[in-house]
Amino acid sequence: MKFMKLGSKPDSFQSEGDNVRYVSSELATDVIVIIGDVKFYLHKFPLLSKSARLQKLITTSTSSSNEENQIHHHHHEDEIEIAEIPGGPASFEICAKFCYGMTVTLNAYNVVAARCAAEFLEMYETVEKGNLVYKIEVFLNSSILQSWKDSIIVLQTTRALSPYSEELKLTGRCLDSIASRASIDTSKVEWSYTYSKKKNLDNGLRKPQAVPRDWWVEDLCDLHIDLYKRALATIEARGNVSADVIGEALHAYAIKRIPGFSKSSSVQVTDFAKYRALADSIIELIPDEKRSVSSSFLTKLLRASIFLGCDEVAGLKNRVGERLDEANLGDVLLYDVELMQSLVEVFLKSRDPREDDVTAKASVAKLVDGYLAEKSRDSDNLPLQKFLSLAEMVSSFPRQSHDGVYRAIDMFLKEHPEMNKSEKKRICRLMDCRKLSAEACAHAVQNERLPMRVVVQVLFFEQVRANNNGSSSTGNSTPEVIPASRSTNTTDQEDTECWDTEDIKALRGELANLRLAKNQQESHNQGKLMKGGGLGVSRVFSKLWSGKERSGDMISSSGTSSPGSVNDDSKSSSSTSKKH
C-alpha cells in the first residue's frame, strides 16, 4: 500500500478521556475547536496560517452563525463549534497536525477524508504555498491512483464521504483509474491482483502463467453494490472487455455478496430488503448477449431471486428457460414443480419449430427425469398429477435410454405405496420398456412395485435382446407373440388379471440361461442353447398370453406390426395419457 508522510515534528497531541484532545506545549492554548462530541484545545497561529475557513471563524467577533459554525468567548479562549466536517474528528486532527508541522501519515484509507476536510477548511495554495490540498492532490495523482488495489480501497472510502467526494470528483477519478486497468491488454498487467481460480499448467510444466482475462473480477467484489454498478458501467463503456468477462465478474460478485448463493440449500437471511436490492441489481447488470453468463449462474441467481422476492424474476426466468438444456440437476433441485414446468414451457417456446434440436431436447429430458426422481422423495409436494404433468411435457423428447424415466417412476412408486393399479398404469405409460438398459431391465424384472403387465413386457424385450445378441443365425429370432408395451385399449380389468407366477419364474429362468450361455463363450453350444432358449421363452409367452387376448394387446409376427415397430404403441400411449 502506498503512503505519504507529512511534517517532521513529533506528534504531541494528547488525550484526556475519549472526548478531549490537546497539544502538549509550554504555550497555553487559545482556541477550542469542537468537532462533534470531541473538543480540541489548540493554538490559533498554526491554524490561521494554513486554513482560510478558520481565519474567518476566529477573527469574527460576532456570534452570528456562518454555515452552522458558532463562535463564543470563554475564559480568554475562542470556542468554535463546527457542526459538520467531512471525516469527523479524525480527519480534522490530520489537518490540525499538518498545521503544526507534526508527522502525519496518509494512505489509501484516510486520504479521501483528509482531502475532503482540507477542502472544507480551505487549505489552499492561496493561503500558503505547499498547503495540504496541493500535497494530497500530488499524492493521489502520482501514487494512489496509479495503484490497482489502492484505487479500489480509496473508491470504497468515497461512499461514506459523499457528497464531498463527488463534488471533488474523487469517486469519478477512482472509477476511471480502475476501468483503465481492467480494460488494459493482459500482457501489460504487472501489478498484483487476487485470483483464486486454479491455474492450469502448460503441458504439465511449471511456466509463468499468462494473466487471465478476468484477473480483476475478484478484487472488485469488496465494493458496495452502488459503486460496483458504476465500476462495471465505466469498464463496459471503454469497450475493451468482452461480455463473458463481465458475466464472470457478476458471478464472482454474487457468490461473495449473496448469502448461500453457491449452496444447495436455503440459508437464513435477516435483511431481505438489502439482499433483494442486491440481487435485482445483479440481474440488471447481466449483458444482453446470450452466452455472457453460464447457465449454472443463471439457475442459482433465479433460485436466490425467488427466495428473496426480487422484482426481476420474470425476465430471469425466461433466460434460464431458454438455456434449460445447459442446466445442472443440482442447480434446479430447489425449484418447485410449477417453476420447472414454466421453465420447460419457456424452453419449448424458444425452440425454432423448423429445427429439430435433438441434443438440446435430450439434455432437457435427462434433466427432468433426474429432477422427478429426486423430487419423488418429497411425497408431500409431488402428487401424481404434478409428476405426470411435468413428465408428459418431455415425454416426446429423444432419449438414448429410458433408464432415467424408469428411475423416476420407481422412486415415485416407492414413496407412494398407496397408489392403486390404475394410477400405477398411468405412470408406467411414460416408460418405453424397449429402451431400458440391461441393468435397468434386471432391476425391473425383480421390482415388485411395478404392475405385473410391465414386468412381463420388460421380460419379453429383455429376452428379445438376449436372443438377438446371442443367436448365430442371421434370421429373425424374435418370438411370434409380442405383448404391446403401451396399449390404447387396456382396461382396469386387465390389471386385475391373475398372472401365473410359475410362468413369470419360467421367463426369468430362461433369461438367466441365455445370459449364462453368452458368458460361456462356447459358440457351438451357445448357439444351440440360445436358439432353444428363445423358443422356450416364446412358448412361455404364448402360454402366458393365451386366453387373455384383447384388442391391441397382441402383435403377431404376421400382423401389421413387427418387433421393431412398436412406435405405434408409443403414439397410442401419448393419446391415452391425454385422457387422464
Curated annotation (Swiss-Prot):
Region (Disordered): 468-497, 548-580
A single GO cellular-component term on record: cytosol
Stored InterPro entries: BTB/POZ_dom (IPR000210), NPH3/RPT2-like (IPR043454), NPH3_dom (IPR027356), SKP1/BTB/POZ_sf (IPR011333)
SUPFAM superfamilies per record: POZ domain
Disruption phenotype: Lost basipetal PIN1 polarization, resulting in abnormal auxin accumulation all over the meristem surface as a result of the lack of an auxin sink. Plants missing NPY1/MAB4 and NPY5/MEL1 form pin-like inflorescences with several leaves and sterile flowers. Triple mutants missing NPY1/MAB4, NPY3/MEL2 and NPY5/MEL1 are sterile and have altered PIN1 localization in organs primordia (e.g.
UniProt domain NPH3: residue ranges: 214-465
Annotated metabolic or biological route of this protein: Protein modification; protein ubiquitination
UniProt feature, compositional bias: Low complexity: 468-478, 553-580
Keywords: Cell membrane, Cytoplasm, Membrane, Phosphoprotein, Ubl conjugation pathway
Subunit composition and interactions: Component of a complex made of PINs (e.g. PIN1 and PIN2), MAB4/MELs (e.g. NPY1/MAB4 and NPY5/MEL1) and AGC kinases (e.g. D6PK and PID) at the plasma membrane. Binds directly to D6PK, PID, PIN1 and PIN2.
Name under which the protein is recorded: Phototropic-responsive NPH3 family protein NPY5
